[in-house]
């Protein structure tokens, strides 16, 4: 959460809050699906308690990137999102697991095995690293780095396959696997998955520690000389 206005109240609850009269078993099941994806069992619910109209609450991204709104009211079958892509949603949105039926996608795809399915009639907000690209497939096929897939419509068939021959896999520098998206529907792709961001920053982190140590060593050396 970035900020919220005075009339906004918040409460942490178990489950996704998709049903106002959801019983304990339903809440446990909903929370369990989030646990499998590595997310928290609880979600924070924000409510406008004011009587003078609309109030605002703003959400910040977990790392540099782009936040996109998607209207589930125009998507009767819902939206499939990678497990780290969901950021926030209107009350009434159901968050469930979407297992890929193809064994290869689950065994080798990493991001491809456990996906989240969002259904409802309100807006959801999806986060992507770097720049986001929306592609409209019309009975077409698209190959993408597995980590770059953010979301896609259920009409899209998702699978994971080896990226070319052995030489390409070892020396290509583009990863061992590619995701194949085939069918008709929209696909959202991110330019900078968080894993790539971490890999890009890792060398600088080491240099920063080394330079910091050198600077501290110089300071202590000067103090001792005195």
Language-model regions, residue ranges each:
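Composition-driven recognition of glycine/serine/threonine/acidic- and proline-rich low-complexity segments
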Residues: 1-226
